[in-house]
């Protein structure tokens, strides 16, 4: 199929010949009476070309209300959810990459307790991708090199804000997917949040973006070498984009999974 968005409509025809193409929903909140609402019976299907790196296992530590593991698995990423036992005693070297969901450092005590094992995994050649975290992450010193967050935190609320690639030749924007202007289209709600504000020179910023009238921000995607491995901190709102089926976000995330030293 040609890449794009397609609307599929459903309808049912009864024995008496009457046709129904609506879906019945109920609006029900404590402060109002339940009220039925009929919407068209439609579903949007998005077709995109997403190339995945050769992966056999990707570990994932889920954050609160995090639907990314299911979204990644739906396009073929071999996801293993990492619980307390895996973080404390599991063989992390079996994973080509380990992804930390947004705010997981606030809700997963085993991640906090075993952060040293995660950094050892990176130093031994692993790839760690940490998605947006809040102030406890900074206060705990969980990153391998110093980072800071502003108060209030740096974010880009305009989902259509222009994005500048700081090093267009870097493999992050070419392997396995060629990232271009179209990949920044169709994002939902925001570009990202809890961007790093200051960082150690060991990190390299890969993107620049900002809301209209605000100064440029470069802390949305930082990459650092840690021993023989790679450590990524990103505030990009993948937790919104992947469940929403945004093709460019999938393609960029696939490229993050392909990062190597």
Segments from the language model and where they lie:
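Catalytic beta-strand/loop cores that center a nucleophilic Ser/Cys/Thr
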Residues: 148-246
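Short amphipathic C-terminal alpha-helix that caps PH/PH-like domains
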Residues: 248-260
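Enriched for extracellular/lumenal, surface-exposed ectodomains of secreted and cell-surface proteins
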Residues: 10-18
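Short glycine/proline/serine/threonine-rich loop/turn segments at secondary-structure transition edges
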Residues: 1-8
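A glycine-rich, often tryptophan-bearing local segment used as a flexible ligand/cofactor-contacting loop or short
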Residues: 103-185, 248
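Alpha-helical scaffolding within the catalytic cores
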Residues: 42-43, 84-87, 113-116, 215-221
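Aromatic-Pro/Gly-enriched surface loop or interdomain linker
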Residues: 19-101, 132-134, 155-156, 240, ...
């Amino acid at each position: 199929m040609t890449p794009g968005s397609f609307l599929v409509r459903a309808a049912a025809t009864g024995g008496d010949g009457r046709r129904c193409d609506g879906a019945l929903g109920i609006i029900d909140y404590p402060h109002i009476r339940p009220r039925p609402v009929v919407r068209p019976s439609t579903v949007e299907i998005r077709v995109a070309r997403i190339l995945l790196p050769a992966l056999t296992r990707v570990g994932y530590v889920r954050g609160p209300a995090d639907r990314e593991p299911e979204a990644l698995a739906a396009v073929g990423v071999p996801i293993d959810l990492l619980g307390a036992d895996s973080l404390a005693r599991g063989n992390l070297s079996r994973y080509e990459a380990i992804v930390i969901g947004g705010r997981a450092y606030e809700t997963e005590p085993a991640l906090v307790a075993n952060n040293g094992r995660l950094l050892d995994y990176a130093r031994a050649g692993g790839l760690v991708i940490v998605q947006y975290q809040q102030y406890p992450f900074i206060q705990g010193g969980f990153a391998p090199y110093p980072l800071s967050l502003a108060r209030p935190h740096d974010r880009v609320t305009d989902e259509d804000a222009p994005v500048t690639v700081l090093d267009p030749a870097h493999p992050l924007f070419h392997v396995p997917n060629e990232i271009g202007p179209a990949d920044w289209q169709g994002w939902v709600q925001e570009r990202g949040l809890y961007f790093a504000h200051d960082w150690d020179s060991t990190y390299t910023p890969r993107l620049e973006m900002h809301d209209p009238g605000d100064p440029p921000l470069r802390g949305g995607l930082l990459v650092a070498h840690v021993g023989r491995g790679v450590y990524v901190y990103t505030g990009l709102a993948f937790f919104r984009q992947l469940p929403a089926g945004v093709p460019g976000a999938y393609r960029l995330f696939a490229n993050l999974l392909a990062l190597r030293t």
